[in-house]
Amino acid sequence: MSTGKIIQVIGAVVDVEFPQETVPNIYSALIVTAKNLTMEVQQQIGGGVVRCIAMGASDGLSRGLDVTDTGKPITVPVGTATLGRIMNVLGEPIDMCGEIGATEHYGIHREAPTYEEQSASVATLEVGIKVIDLICPFSKGGKIGLFGGAGVGKTVNMMELINNIALKHSGLSVFAGVGERTREGNDFYFEMQEAGVVNVEKPELSKVAMVYGQMNEPPGNRLRVALTGLTMAERFRDEGKDVLLFIDNIYRYTLAGTEVSALLGRMPSAVGYQPTLAEEMGVLQERITSTKTGSITSIQAVYVPADDLTDPAPATTFAHLDATVVLNRSIASMGLYPAIDPLDSTSRQLDPLVVGQEHYDIARGVQGTLQRYKELKDIIAILGMDELSEDDKLVVSRARKIGNFLTQAYHVAEVFTGDPGMYVPLKDTLAGFKGLLAGDYDDLPEQAFLYIGAIEEAVEKAKKM
């Protein structure tokens, strides 16, 4: 192990000089022994000098401090010892429950599975949320993105999906909190304890491993914490297990890359993002895949800056996903939750050969009705409802009922709303929308369809109105 000295500190970026013959490799982990700080090599800039990112606060660093090259990348504990524990980017426990007794450690930088090793699946994952199961069904072993601006419900939807899938799913889950609120991470941990998914007394009985690099962490932590979580998920997958990987929020991973890129002296590209945006996203996303031994189904929240889906960060993420769930502020402003836009959300599973002809026809029928209503809104605003033809009046009436029927009470929102959460099986969802499109419920008031599960509840609700 060679030793070097710090020669420059600029925020989270540190330059270290080593003897010419022992310059560390890119992505090698270096340790500032006096401060017990880990750094990662990003560039070799000549003359034995390497430029590194600090994986922690660089406060108190000074020129001349000794730095040791470990000769290997950052390694983190993997395997069952990580279950039920909260770790940071380096795999160190931050839950005050003692050491992690892992026998194996993996480097966080690994190759994506080869084309021969990968395995595609067309099996559909039922999540019990009507709008998702109908319009943008998830695939087992697929990648799903939850897109939305600030405050439209990405984290609540993510938590409901964890509640509906992870709690009913017999496999293991990994949750990576990337640059999000510490309070949400804390709430998540205690909710998982209440649900029995995390067992503090017997961690080996837990079903989820948690890796946090939250908003207050330096950019180095936020840039690498997603890779730490992914490495743990890959280990479970390679054991032949079906793993769920939740990442909240993938945009903060991009943003950390932007912060680091500027400090490393790279020329910014569009909107100030790093020039390596597409490559950094690809390196992460290509590893999130299913192989012939096991599967990783990943659900990622994606913050959309200023509600602009054409922003380079969300636009780069789109290319990697199998299903996109787009949250719309205008739907949220009408008090309709989940605020998922059925016209913007897509899934490659919505194919008659995968979900069946009936499901496909119902989904397209719902979208067609909502699209026609969207087109008529301008006419209604100018001329009023009376100027519409009878057919168009019927379309408007059905579209409003469909919009209301797409709402649903969430288990995780029970504490705020007081309404008990509900899980709606796919067959009930299809039966309800089929009846609405066929006109079976044209005589019911549209308020009867708000926040109900199966369509029969609307009939009962209408009787009380």
UniProtKB/Swiss-Prot annotation:
InterPro entries: AAA+_ATPase (IPR003593), ATP-synt_VA_C (IPR055190), ATP_synth_F1_bsu (IPR005722), ATPase_a/bsu_AS (IPR020003), ATPase_alpha/beta_chains (IPR050053), ATPase_F1/V1/A1_a/bsu_N (IPR004100), ATPase_F1/V1/A1_a/bsu_N_sf (IPR036121), ATPase_F1/V1/A1_a/bsu_nucl-bd (IPR000194)
Keyword flag Cell inner membrane: yes
Positions contributing to ATP binding: G148, G149, A150, G151, V152, G153, K154, T155
Gene3D superfamilies: 2.40.10.170, Bovine Mitochondrial F1-atpase, Atp Synthase Beta Chain, Chain D, domain 3, P-loop containing nucleotide triphosphate hydrolases
Chief location category: membrane
Coiled-coil features, chain-numbered ranges: none
Key words of the record: ATP synthesis, ATP-binding, Cell inner membrane, Cell membrane, CF(1), Hydrogen ion transport, Ion transport, Membrane, Nucleotide-binding, Translocase, Transport
GO molecular function annotations of the record: ATP binding; ATP hydrolysis activity; proton-transporting ATP synthase activity, rotational mechanism
Disulfide topology: none
Catalysed reactions, semicolon-separated: ATP + H2O + 4 H(+)(in) = ADP + phosphate + 5 H(+)(out)
Membrane topology recorded in Swiss-Prot or TrEMBL: Peripheral membrane protein
Family: Belongs to the ATPase alpha/beta chains family.
Protein name: ATP synthase subunit beta 2
Protein's gene: atpD2
